[in-house]
UniProtKB/Swiss-Prot annotation:
Protein name: Large ribosomal subunit protein uL18
CDD domains in alphabetical order: Ribosomal_L18_L5e
Ribosomal protein listed as a keyword: yes
GO cellular component, one term: cytosolic large ribosomal subunit
InterPro entries associated with the record: Ribosomal_uL18_bac-type (IPR004389), Ribosomal_uL18_bac/euk (IPR005484)
Origin superkingdom: Bacteria
Keywords associated with the record: Ribonucleoprotein, Ribosomal protein, RNA-binding, rRNA-binding
Family as reported in the entry's similarity comment: Belongs to the universal ribosomal protein uL18 family.
Subunit structure: Part of the 50S ribosomal subunit; part of the 5S rRNA/L5/L18/L25 subcomplex. Contacts the 5S and 23S rRNAs.
GO molecular function ontology, one term from the record: 5S rRNA binding
Length: 119
């Protein structure tokens, strides 16, 4: 009999493994990514204070278009980079959220780099 693996459970397990090693401070906060079927979300977090400093997603009012493709992820990456630079954040630690660094997650990271963030 074949075992059917729960993808969400495996992703959360990978995310916990990655989060043990990644930690965001106020000087170098963490850029966290979450992707759903229809949208993509990114937020910059200070783990010491436990606060979200900046957030952007394909659900925001300034975003136009389909939120579930690679182009949308790149736009969200540029949006979060612009908001972060306005707040004086130039360097972040990238947290891929247990997802493979490919497709929408990779495009969001590239968009953030193009926007001026360093990680």
């Amino acid at each position: 009999m074949f075992k059917k693996y729960d993808k969400k459970k495996l992703r959360k397990k990978r995310h916990l493994r990655v989060r043990k090693k990644i930690f965001g401070t106020s000087e170098v906060p963490r850029l966290s990514v979450y992707r759903s079927e229809k949208n993509i979300y990114a937020q910059i977090i200070d783990d010491i204070k436990g606060t979200t400093l900046v957030s952007a997603s394909s659900v925001d009012k300034d975003f136009k278009g389909n939120g579930s493709n690679k182009e949308a992820a790149k736009v969200v990456g540029k949006m979060i980079a612009d908001k972060a630079i306005e707040k004086g954040i130039k360097e972040v630690v990238f947290d891929r959220g247990g997802y493979i660094y490919h497709g929408r997650v990779q495009n969001l990271a590239e968009g953030a780099r193009e926007g001026g963030l360093q990680f």
